[in-house]
Amino acid sequence: MKVLVLGLCRTGTSSLYVAQKELGMKPYHFRDIAFNTEHMKLWLTAMRAKFDGVGKPFQGKDFDQMLGEYDSVADTPACFFVEELLAAYPEAKVILTTRSPQSWLHSMQNTLITVISWRSWTVLSLFDREHSAFYWPLFNRIMRVMAKGNDPWKASATPSYLEYFDEHYTKVRRLVPKDRLLEWHPSQGWEPVCEFLDFPVPEKEFPHICTSDGNVRTHRSTYWKRWRNVVQKGAQTVGLVGLTVGGIWYFRSRLVGSSR
């Protein structure tokens, strides 16, 4: 592990993730978790241990179960484990992706807070045992951390989001030595990142991705795809049950008829 990107989600972590790939690195991001059932389960276990006191806290090589094959890690839920990751990977450099608290909150309201307000997530997770049964508990727990235990979709959680943002950034700045830390905003582009990580600056433009509209659109697409999958499987099950009942009735009627 060479780089810990400890900024919160919606601070340019996706753009930096793509940029690191273009530099030849192998970064890890929530994108790598979202469709990996085992990783979703591991991170949820780690979060329950840290925030709920359930089970043994993750430390040291425990994180290698998820991060062992990568040389950089970013985004939630990894960025919640500041002390643990600093202890597990003491030689890693730290990039703190930044933006103003109010612009971060506005971005969150237009993306993840909107997505978590889709209240049928819970119902979907009961029927979609292949994906949503793992994704929803993790996503919900992530959002509750940033809402400081409040219902993350409610307007009353707004002050808590801002408090968490301030506490998180204060903690990272306090724990990481300045010579090991780069505070970076996506508008700064390649130069600070490449200088900090000892890479030549690419000639291509720095990638700016994951707009608010794009984030919600991606979630909505996945959300309805999972619902369609549930409905299709339900229809298949109903059809199979109907076929079975019909078959039993047919053979039973033949058997009764032949005995007369």
UniProtKB/Swiss-Prot annotation:
InterPro entries assigned to the protein according to its UniProt record, in alphabetical order: P-loop_NTPase, Sulfotransfer_4
Alphabetic keyword roster: Signal
Pfam family, any one: Sulfotransfer_4
Pathway(s) per entry: Secondary metabolite biosynthesis
SUPFAM superfamilies listed in its UniProt record: P-loop containing nucleoside triphosphate hydrolases
Task performed by this protein: Part of the cluster that mediates the biosynthesis of a highly modified cyclo-arginine-tryptophan dipeptide (cRW). The first step of the pathway is perfornmed by the arginine-containing cyclodipeptide synthase (RCPDS) avaA that acts as the scaffold-generating enzyme and is responsible for formation of the cyclo-Arg-Trp (cRW) diketopiperazine. AvaB then acts as a multifunctional flavoenzyme that is responsible for generating the cyclo-Arg-formylkynurenine DKP, which can be deformylated by avaC. AvaB then further catalyzes an additional N-oxidation followed by cyclization and dehydration.
Keyword Hydrolase attached: no
Native source organism of the sequence: Aspergillus versicolor
Disulfide bonds: none
Name of the protein in question: Ava biosynthesis cluster protein M
Similarity-based family: Belongs to the cytochrome P450 family.
Gene3D superfamilies xref list: P-loop containing nucleotide triphosphate hydrolases
Span of the signal peptide: 1-15
